[in-house]
């Protein structure tokens, strides 16, 4: 699998699995994408989530379906999300980390023709600890 890069996201990204459990992270993530010219379409795991910015309750609420998605859910939900995204024409998916994905899920994506990456986009866009994490992980910014 190739390393995550800014180009992977293109101009827009659908974020699946964001919740109000870690509100600060999602606010920073949203800001980081927007600051880099990437339009964000967040879909919380619970529609009642109040993240402090616009979210979408379902795929039908989205004004467009981005070709790229970023998944922040547990493995138990990821496979179902991939089925939905594949049916909507999403062809690139980045996963937050190992809690979201395993080899079986990656093979499923491959069989569906979905390009995948693993890693937190904050390593690409943020500073401070995220910048240090990017250096350790070998992520080129």
Question: Predicted segments — roles?
Answer:
Residues 1-51:
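Hydrophobic, well-ordered beta-alpha structural blocks that scaffold small-molecule cofactor pockets
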Residues 36-38, 88-92, 112-115:
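A short helix->loop->beta-strand "cap" motif at the edges of active sites that frequently abuts
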Residues 46-74:
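Mobile, glycine- and charge-enriched loop segments
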Residues 50, 63-65, 101-126:
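Short acidic, glycine/proline-enriched helix-loop-strand junctions
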Residues 70-78, 95-100:
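N-terminal glycine-rich "phosphate-gripper" loop used for MgATP/nucleotide binding
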Residues 85-109:
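ADP-ribose/adenylate-binding Rossmann-like module
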């Amino acid at each position: 699998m190739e390393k995550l890069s800014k180009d992977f996201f293109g101009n827009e990204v659908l974020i699946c699995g964001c919740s109000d459990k870690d509100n600060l992270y999602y606010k920073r993530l949203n800001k980081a994408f927007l600051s880099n010219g990437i339009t964000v379409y967040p879909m919380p795991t619970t529609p009642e989530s109040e993240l402090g910015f616009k979210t979408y309750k379902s795929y039908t609420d989205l004004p467009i379906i981005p070709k790229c998605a970023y998944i922040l859910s547990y493995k138990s939900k990821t496979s179902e999300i991939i089925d939905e995204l594949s049916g909507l024409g999403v062809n690139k998916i980045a996963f937050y980390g190992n809690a979201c994905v395993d080899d079986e899920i990656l093979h499923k994506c491959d069989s569906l023709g979905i390009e995948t990456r693993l890693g937190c986009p904050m390593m690409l866009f943020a500073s401070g600890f995220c910048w240090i994490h990017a250096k350790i992980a070998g992520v080129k910014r």
